[in-house]
Swiss-Prot record:
It comes from the Bacteria. Belongs to the polyribonucleotide nucleotidyltransferase family. Component of the RNA degradosome, which is a multiprotein complex involved in RNA processing and mRNA degradation. Its cofactor is Mg(2+). Residues 553-612 form the KH domain. Its main location: cytoplasm. The lineage of its organism: Bacteria, Pseudomonadati, Pseudomonadota, Gammaproteobacteria, Enterobacterales. This is Polyribonucleotide nucleotidyltransferase. Mg(2+) binds at residues 486, 492. It is found in: Cytoplasm. GO terms for cellular component: cytosol.
Length: 707
């Protein structure tokens, strides 16, 4: 019999329901988690056997949105969901980040979490309930897990923090912050803001963490009633004799290697030491486990680096704890791009380009919460050569998508509106060197490249990555961390913003016990570092260029009467197609009569504008127009006096004298001047040649007429 076990509770303005025991009973745990009408079904499956040679914790999180959740059928030929969208990948990462640090350090069993959106209210984003559902499922599974965690979205509207605001409210919010943590510790923060102060961001983090305690308590209550027996895990004992031998013989060598400032030289030296250790002990005992030697080696590396930092010695590359690496800033280095910059910070380097396009280049996004158009694209590429390695080159991986999204969010607060700058903007960051915080280098490079492209951003944006080493009550904050400091430290805290405040933030903790005071200090240290970087950037380029690149399309905007749109488009698009081909421009028309003409050549755009104005001009009775004969019939001739406007010159209106045959007086494609006699109720034009003054009808006048 199916035996549902349910917890239902109020969470801010929403009702949360967690149900287990009915669906997917062969998984280690399964939870149907819902926030009002948005429901996510989360399963957890773990392997009790560790794969041979496993060196890292193989946790996989899959987040998938089913279109039936919104009552829709997928598009495309196959009419079914395909590869994960960018939003699905980003949400999977959001679920993963607060959960990963809560597994035991030596736990190497494969775990898969699958979160499937099965019902969605467009006003309630599924990401928060997905984290809650995953936390609940892990807590029920019996898998070793130091949870549960809660999650909350915090908005900031009218100087007040709002818990889990609905989508409509988020449009008026100056903050979109997601925070997740355990009862006592904050583990993950992801935020985008409209230039808020450090104090307001910290207040939002604390508010969100306090509010989510009700979630944690209810998951614990559910776990007490429905959790499975905990796994019995035996971790292999470390060979203490081997560890002591390696420490006594090689710790000093490893310590000396970590005073080599150059990353590649340091890696080469460390690899050489490791190879010597493995060779030495294999010669003594051919059956020795080399993986164990590597584990001991990594443990010594971590101990050496952390001990040096905590004892206030210089860091790996010789810097003090709050020192920023040497900066080199260059703009306009790619001659044919619309904007470019090269931002170098120590051994981390980003080559950024900006391309301007029309609204046709915008990305149409078919998302579960509704369709939307994105006019600002940010793509981050991390090729293997950036870290001196050989690797696969292809479609972007999850990490690249996540870093690109963070960099994009860092810039959104300063981007111009479409009304002020009607371009689609694509930014591409090529990471050409990497040794820590390449995403924040991308933010700095993108800010410079946008200004180089003439994009009128409100102010420059810079980013910095902060680190932390904590042992007991002692802790040291590090500014502008290296890759090794990220790997061997306890926190990765990325902060981006302007001189006035923060635009984006991403924080990932690897340990519990990070206090609010430490977060506050990290925010303040990040502000000082950000101001230093902005000062260097402003020396290279302190405002957007007044003109866009000569190679970028110029967009000219005119307004026409909406009733005239059909005249510009023509039957089956014939007129606008002809205009586009003949003028060499791109013409876009909106329903309100806004016409955008884009071209890299100013004269071509002017020509297109002139011809559109001719088409949309109001025909006045009694006015004389230049026209072209388009058809000759027995009873007269049809004359075009502008694209889409054709009138009849009756045979009686050709001349004062009797006209026996129209073709004796007029020829096809002949340019003539005509006078508008009448516009009937159906908009048809009655034209005349004979009514025009004889001076205008001179051959010279006719031959010089242009339409």
């Amino acid at each position: 019999m199916l035996n549902p076990i349910v917890r239902k509770f109020q969470y801010g303005q929403h009702t949360i329901t967690l149900e287990t025991g009915v669906i997917a009973r062969q998984a280690n745990a399964a939870v149907m988690a819902s926030m009002d009408e948005t429901a996510v079904f989360v399963t957890v499956v773990g392997q009790k056997k560790i794969h041979t040679g496993q060196k890292f914790f193989p946790l996989t999180v899959n987040y998938q949105e089913r279109t039936y959740a919104a009552g829709r059928i997928p598009g495309g030929f196959f009419r079914r969901e395909g590869r994960p969208s960018e939003n699905e990948i980003l949400t999977a990462r959001l679920i993963d980040r607060p959960l990963r640090p809560l597994f035991p350090k030596k736990f190497l069993n494969e775990i898969q979490i699958i979160a499937t959106v099965v019902s969605v209210n467009p006003q309630i984003n599924p990401d928060i309930i997905s984290i809650i559902g995953a936390s609940a499922a892990l807590s029920l599974s019996g898998i070793p897990f130091y949870g549960p965690v809660g999650a909350a979205r915090v908005g900031y509207i009218n100087n007040q923090y709002i818990l889990n605001p609905i989508s409509d409210d988020m449009k008026n919010s100056s903050l979109d912050l997601v925070v997740s943590g355990t009862q006592n510790a904050i583990l993950m923060v992801e935020a985008e803001s409209k230039i808020l102060s450090e104090e307001k961001i910290l207040g939002a983090i604390i508010f969100g963490h306090q509010q989510q305690q009700v979630v944690i308590n209810n998951i614990r209550s559910l776990s007490n009633e429905a959790s499975k027996l905990p796994w019995v895990i035996s971790y292999p004992e470390t060979n203490k004799t081997l560890e002591l031998k390696i420490i006594n013989s090689f710790e000093k060598n490893i310590s000396d290697a970590y005073v080599i400032f150059n990353k590649q030289d340091r890696i080469e030296k460390l690899n050489s030491i490791k190879e010597n250790i493995i060779k030495l002990f294999l010669d003594e005992n051919s059956n020795i486990d080399t993986l164990e030697i590597e584990d001991i080696f990594q443990k010594i590396e971590k101990k050496v680096v952390r001990k040096r930092i905590l004892s206030n010695q210089t860091r790996i590359d010789g810097r003090e704890k709050d020192m920023i690496r040497a900066l080199d800033v260059r703009t306009g280095i790619l001659p044919r791009t619309h904007g470019s910059a090269l931002f170098t910070r120590g051994e981390t380097q980003s080559l950024v380009s900006v391309t301007l396009g029309t609204s046709r280049d915008a990305q149409n996004l078919d998302e579960l919460l509704g369709d939307r158009i994105d006019n600002f694209l940010f793509h981050y590429n991390f090729p293997p050569y950036s870290v001196g390695e050989i690797g696969m080159v292809g479609s972007p991986k999850r990490r690249e998508i996540g870093h690109g999204r963070l960099a994009k969010r860092s810039l959104l607060a300063v981007m111009p509106t479409l009304e002020n700058f009607p371009y689609t903007i694509r930014v591409v960051s090529e990471i050409t060197e990497s040794n820590g915080s390449s995403s924040m280098a991308s933010v700095c490079g993108a800010s410079l490249a946008l200004m180089d492209a003439g994009v009128p951003i409100k102010s420059a944006v810079a980013g910095i990555s902060m680190g932390l080493v904590k042992e007991g009550n002692q802790h040291v904050l590090l500014s502008d961390i290296l890759g090794d400091e990220d790997h061997l430290g306890d926190m990765d805290f990325k902060v981006a913003g302007t001189e006035e405040g923060i635009t984006a933030l991403q924080m990932d903790m690897k340990i519990e016990g990070i206090t609010n005071e430490i977060i506050h200090s990290a925010l303040n240290e990040a502000r000082l570092a950000r101001l230093h970087i902005l000062n260097v950037m402003n020396q290279a380029l302190n405002e957007s260029r007044s003109e866009i690149s000569e190679f970028a399309p110029r967009i000219h905007i005119i307004k026409i009467n909406p009733e005239k749109i059909k005249d510009v488009i023509g039957k089956g698009g014939s007129v606008i197609r002809m205009l586009t081909e003949e003028t060499g421009t791109i013409i876009e028309i909106e329903d309100d009569g806004t016409v955008k003409i884009s071209s890299t050549v100013k004269e071509k755009a002017k020509n297109a504008i002139r011809r559109i104005k001719e088409i949309t001009a109001e025909i006045e009775v009694g006015r004389i127009y230049s026209g072209k004969v388009t058809r000759i019939v027995d009873f007269g001739a049809f004359v075009s006096i502008g694209l889409g406007k054709e009138g009849l010159v009756h045979i009686s209106q050709i001349s004062d004298k009797r006209v026996d045959k129209v073709s004796n007086h007029l020829k096809i494609d002949q340019i003539i001047s005509v006078k508008v006699l009448e516009i009937d109720r159906q908009g048809r034009l009655r034209l005349s040649i004979k009514e025009i003054d004889s001076s205008i009808l001179s051959n010279k006048s006719i031959n010089n007429s242009i339409i």
